[in-house]
Protein backbone atom coordinates (compact mmCIF):
# COMPACT_ATOMS: atom_id res chain seq x y z
CA UNK A 1 0.00 0.00 0.00
CA UNK A 2 2.84 2.38 0.84
CA UNK A 3 4.64 1.46 -2.38
CA UNK A 4 1.52 2.07 -4.48
CA UNK A 5 1.05 5.44 -2.80
CA UNK A 6 4.63 6.42 -3.60
CA UNK A 7 4.23 5.32 -7.22
CA UNK A 8 1.00 7.31 -7.58
CA UNK A 9 2.66 10.35 -6.06
CA UNK A 10 5.63 10.02 -8.45
CA UNK A 11 3.32 9.70 -11.46
CA UNK A 12 1.28 12.71 -10.31
CA UNK A 13 4.42 14.82 -9.76
CA UNK A 14 5.79 13.80 -13.16
CA UNK A 15 2.51 14.67 -14.86
CA UNK A 16 2.32 18.05 -13.11
CA UNK A 17 5.92 18.84 -14.10
CA UNK A 18 5.26 17.89 -17.73
CA UNK A 19 2.13 20.05 -17.85
CA UNK A 20 4.03 22.97 -16.34
CA UNK A 21 6.88 22.48 -18.81
CA UNK A 22 4.51 22.45 -21.78
CA UNK A 23 2.62 25.51 -20.56
CA UNK A 24 5.77 27.52 -19.95
CA UNK A 25 7.17 26.58 -23.37
CA UNK A 26 4.19 28.16 -25.10
CA UNK A 27 4.27 31.21 -22.85
CA UNK A 28 8.02 31.73 -23.36
CA UNK A 29 7.51 31.76 -27.13
CA UNK A 30 4.75 34.33 -26.84
CA UNK A 31 6.83 36.43 -24.44
CA UNK A 32 9.79 36.39 -26.84
CA UNK A 33 7.61 37.68 -29.66
CA UNK A 34 6.16 40.38 -27.39
CA UNK A 35 9.59 41.41 -26.13
CA UNK A 36 10.90 41.74 -29.69
CA UNK A 37 7.91 43.89 -30.59
CA UNK A 38 8.41 46.16 -27.58
CA UNK A 39 12.12 46.43 -28.39
CA UNK A 40 11.24 47.58 -31.92
CA UNK A 41 8.68 50.01 -30.51
CA UNK A 42 11.32 51.45 -28.18
CA UNK A 43 13.78 51.92 -31.05
CA UNK A 44 11.11 53.63 -33.14
CA UNK A 45 10.14 55.88 -30.23
CA UNK A 46 13.80 56.77 -29.63
CA UNK A 47 14.13 57.76 -33.30
CA UNK A 48 10.95 59.82 -33.11
CA UNK A 49 12.18 61.47 -29.90
CA UNK A 50 15.53 62.38 -31.48
CA UNK A 51 13.64 63.87 -34.41
CA UNK A 52 11.41 65.87 -32.10
CA UNK A 53 8.28 63.87 -32.94
CA UNK A 54 7.83 62.14 -29.58
CA UNK A 55 7.77 63.46 -26.04
CA UNK A 56 9.99 62.34 -23.19
CA UNK A 57 6.93 60.80 -21.56
CA UNK A 58 6.35 58.62 -24.64
CA UNK A 59 10.01 57.60 -24.66
CA UNK A 60 10.00 56.67 -20.97
CA UNK A 61 6.73 54.79 -21.39
CA UNK A 62 8.29 52.77 -24.21
CA UNK A 63 11.37 52.07 -22.06
CA UNK A 64 9.26 51.02 -19.09
CA UNK A 65 7.12 48.72 -21.20
CA UNK A 66 10.14 47.16 -22.90
CA UNK A 67 11.84 46.54 -19.53
CA UNK A 68 8.64 45.03 -18.12
CA UNK A 69 8.42 42.65 -21.08
CA UNK A 70 12.09 41.68 -20.67
CA UNK A 71 11.49 41.07 -16.96
CA UNK A 72 8.45 38.92 -17.72
CA UNK A 73 10.53 36.87 -20.17
CA UNK A 74 13.24 36.29 -17.56
CA UNK A 75 10.63 35.21 -15.00
CA UNK A 76 9.08 32.78 -17.50
CA UNK A 77 12.51 31.31 -18.24
CA UNK A 78 13.05 30.88 -14.51
CA UNK A 79 9.65 29.18 -14.24
CA UNK A 80 10.63 26.85 -17.09
CA UNK A 81 13.93 25.94 -15.42
CA UNK A 82 12.04 25.26 -12.20
CA UNK A 83 9.67 22.97 -14.13
CA UNK A 84 12.65 21.06 -15.58
CA UNK A 85 14.03 20.60 -12.07
CA UNK A 86 10.63 19.40 -10.83
CA UNK A 87 10.48 16.91 -13.71
CA UNK A 88 13.99 15.67 -12.94
CA UNK A 89 13.10 15.19 -9.29
CA UNK A 90 9.77 13.51 -10.09
CA UNK A 91 11.50 11.11 -12.46
CA UNK A 92 13.81 10.01 -9.66
CA UNK A 93 16.70 12.38 -10.11
CA UNK A 94 18.77 13.06 -7.04
CA UNK A 95 18.32 16.79 -6.56
CA UNK A 96 19.45 18.16 -3.24
CA UNK A 97 19.11 21.88 -2.61
CA UNK A 98 21.79 23.51 -0.48
CA UNK A 99 20.66 25.12 2.73
CA UNK A 100 21.13 28.88 2.84
CA UNK A 101 23.84 28.67 5.50
CA UNK A 102 25.82 25.86 3.82
CA UNK A 103 28.84 26.63 1.70
CA UNK A 104 29.15 24.76 -1.62
Language-model features, listed with the residues they occupy:
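Amphipathic alpha-helical coiled-coil segments
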Residues: 1-72, 79, 83-90
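Terminal intrinsically disordered/low-complexity segments used for targeting and assembly
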Residues: 89-104
